[in-house]
Amino acid sequence: DVAPSRGLGDVYKRQYQHWSYDTLHRLCMEAFQKFGFTEAEADIIQDVLLTADLYGIESHGMQRMVRYHKCIEKGMIDVHAKPEVVFETPISAVIDAHEAMGQLVSHKAMEMAIEKAKTTGVGIVSVRNSNHYGIAGYYAKMACKEGLMGFSCTNSEAIMVPTFARKAMLGSNPIACAFPAEPYDFFFDASTTVVTRGKLEMYNKMEKPLPEGWALDKDGHPSTNAPDVLANIVAKKGGGIMPLGGSTEQLGSHKGYGYGMLCEIFSSILSMGATSNYCMTGGKGQICHGFMAINPAYFGDPAAIKEHFSKYLQELRDAPKADGQERIYTHGEKEVAAVKRIMENGIPVNDNTMVEVLDLCNYLGMDFGSYFGDYRPPVKKDVFKGNY
C-alpha cells in the first residue's frame, strides 16, 4: 500500500481533508483561467498538478497553485509569454521560455522531443528562462505513453548544499525516466537532494521538526527547523538541503551531488541558461529544463524489447525477500496503486493549504462554497510568513 504522501508518513494523518478529483479539477480550471491562462493552457497546468496529487506527491500538487499566483503577481511568471525555439536540428532544440509558465513550455518541449524521436530515433530539447514545471515524471510519462523512453529533468532555485560546502549552489534537480513495460510501466522520478523544498514546506505547514539528516542551517550545521531553513533558502543566507546520500562521502553524498550536476548539464548548460545558483534572482525564475525521448524501434523490435524488460521487472519482483518483507516493488507500481486508492478515497489536501485556497478564492472572486460546501478550514495562519 502507498502512504498518503511519499516520504511524509504520519505527518498528515490528522490535518487534511479529502476532495474528489472532479472538485479539484474544476477549482484549478477556474483559478488558472482567472490567472489569465486560456482554457487549453489551464487544462495542461491542472493536469500536471493533479497528476502529482494522484501519485501521492502533495508537495507538487494543487498546493502549488497559490504560489504560482504569487509569482504571476510579482511578474516572475508571464501569463502571455510566447516560448521561442532559438536553435534546432533534426534531433535537438533549445527553447527560450521568456518566463512562461513552466508546465506550458515543458509540455511543448516534450511534444517536440517525441516527434523528433519518432522521426529520427531520438529527440532532445533543452529549455531556458522558464519557471517551476511540476513533477519531472509527468513529462517522462508523456513519451512513455507514445511507446518511447522518456527522460526529464529540471534545475531550480539553489537549495542543495554541495558536499563539504555550507551554501546551496544546486537545485533539487530531479531526474525522471519512464519506459514501457507490462503490467506496469517503469517510472522513476526523484530529486537529487535528500528531499525537495516542497517537503520542507509541508513540514512547515504542519509545524513539525524536520527529520535528522535533511537540512543544514546557514552555518552548515544540521538543522531540523523548517521555517529557518526555508527562510535562509529564500534570503540566500546559506544552508539548505543535503544531496541524496546525506552530508558525507561515506554515505554517498558526492553521488547525489554528481547526479544533480548531470541534471544541470541537460537543463541549464546545454540551453545556455541560468544555473541553479542564479535561478529565482532579480525577480525572474530563469529555471531550465531538459527533455529526451528515445525510440526503441531504432534498437530492434519494440514489442520484443518491451517483453524483455517486462520479464526482468517481474524477476525483480520475484526475487527472494528480506526477512519481514512481503513484497518487492519495481518503480511505477506504487504510483499505479496510489492513483487507484486516491481516486476512490479522494485527494488529501492539508488544512493550511485550504486556508490559502480560501484566501485565493476571496481574492479572485471565486465561490469557495461551490466547491467545498460548508467546509471552512479551522486554521488561519500564514505559515510561509509571506514567502510562497
Predicted regions and their residues:
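Phosphate/diphosphate-binding glycine-rich loops and adjacent basic-rich segments that engage nucleotide
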Residues: 160-234
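Acidic, glycine/proline-rich low-complexity segments that act as flexible tails and inter-domain linkers
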Residues: 13-21, 26-45, 50-51, 58-79, ...
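Active-site cofactor/substrate anionic-group-binding motifs, chiefly glycine-
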Residues: 60-114
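Single conserved hydrophobic/aromatic residue that forms the stacking wall/gate
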Residues: 1-12
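A generic, well-ordered mixed alpha/beta core segment in the N-terminal half of proteins
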Residues: 90-182, 190-191
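Catalytic-core signal marking the mid-to-C-terminal active-site face
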Residues: 14-19, 24-27, 265, 270-272, ...
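Secondary-shell segments that build the walls of catalytic and ion/ligand-binding clefts
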Residues: 209-278
